[in-house]
Amino acid sequence: MFIKCHGSYLGFTGFNNHTRGFFRGLSKYAKIYVRNFTVDGNSSSYINDEDKQILSEQTLWSNYKNTSVRMDYPFEWNQEYLDVDINERIHLITAENSHHYFYDNYYGPKIAFTMWESDTYNPDFLNILKNYDSNIVLTKWQKECLIKQGFDESKIDIVHEGIEPDCFPIEQEKSNKFKFFLVGKWGFRKAIKETIECFLKTFEHIDDVELHITVDNAHPIWIPTEERLRMYNLLSPKIIIHSFPDRDVYLRILKNCNVFLSCSRGEGWNIPLAEALACGIPSIYSKGSGQLEFASEYPLGVDILKKIPAYHEEDKYFADGYVDEPNFEMLSEVLLDSYKNYSTYKKIHLQKCQHFISKYTWNKVSKDLFDVINKRYGSISLNNQGYIKFHRFSEDLNGIFFSQSYFDSCKVYIEITNENGDLYFFNDLIMMKNVEHCFGSEVQGKKIFT
């Protein structure tokens, strides 16, 4: 059996890192190929030859004859599109929300890999997930939330998030400033505004303290971080903005800060917090949701005051259920404690970081993922043979289209002539109605089986 992985492989968000980490790791244990749904103009900076071996296709929204349609394209480095017989593959779909990939009609075994930040899945999406053979989640908390909503416990597996190998402690650069570091997309869930307000109030009369932030948010509309701070009267010489830093810059800031700061209302995992712990950085966190899977044994936790609705109209955060409201008065106390007793907390975190790293390496968690899949389906290995290669007949990518079905699928043999008169051939599970809608009389298809 092969594993066809569907997810957001390209990009710089936490979930892009999550997807790449798992798919890269899984490829060491099983034959996989990947369908990606994100775009990143800077992907050449991190996509390597191993990635190119497993990245098979990408789903993009295209405008064809004034109609917005979802199209699948081969990647530019592929001379052939790779697939396997539909009876020999398992589908693994991972996305950070109720993404359209979850609604596709997959032939054969299918596994959902979901990460949720509130305590309640969207009911319609949950009904879709119930049709999957199993659902992999990151934490016990997420599993408990699913069970409370009536999800079959026997269909839930837990696989933890991984840590990038570039996360480890260093000898820090000397500085005359005590540096806090706050990371996360500005918004309601991450409680960025409230956290900055608390910091400024706490250290109003202490001069040797800085708060470094990387909190840019391009949605729903782009507002520069400096402008957001001005809107809420939070501009201060104590705040140092780092806008969309490259990975090496981000790590240099993280590894040289004194205390990492996070006080969010809901986390599926909290990758920045995990990376800070791996680097031996004393870390402040809110004591709720998914991050407790790995952070609860650390001392700088902030209590939860109450549950509040997750839905937040102003911030366009449309989650169901509830999230945790941190006690921001207690956050002020923890901030001061971490500042005054820094050497004690630094020693504790340095003592713990090597064990933490070994527990969450990508190699380990990817092996856990493989074991979970193999236990349910078996017959998965690196030695599987049988890739079917669908050759392209032109180097020009324009005009090569295929699409997967939301509804009734069939195996087809398709010939497509584009506007230049070029003829293309390909095979895949596609929805004939969608293809005919996109290409009209240009399409000739023969159904092989349903």
What is each residue range found by the language model?
Residues M1-I86, G399, Q404:
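N-terminal pre-catalytic "stem/leader" segment of glycosyltransferase-like enzymes
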Residues K4, E173-K190, I196-F199, L211-I213:
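Conserved donor-binding/catalytic core segment of Leloir-type glycosyltransferases
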Residues K4, N48-I147, V249, M432-E436, ...:
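Extended catalytic core of nucleotide-activated donor transferases of GT-like folds
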Residues P123-D124, G162-F178:
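Acidic anion/phosphate-binding donor-loop and adjacent secondary structure
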Residues I223-D248:
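Nucleotide-activated donor-binding/catalytic signature segment of Leloir-type glycosyltransferases, i.e.
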Residues R265:
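Aromatic "clamp/platform" in nucleotide-sugar-dependent glycosyltransferases that forms part
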Residues P282-Y285, L300-D303:
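Short hydrophobic beta-strand element within catalytic cores of glycosyltransferases
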Residues V323-L331, K340-D371:
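A charged, aromatic-enriched C-terminal amphipathic alpha-helix characteristic of glycosyltransferases
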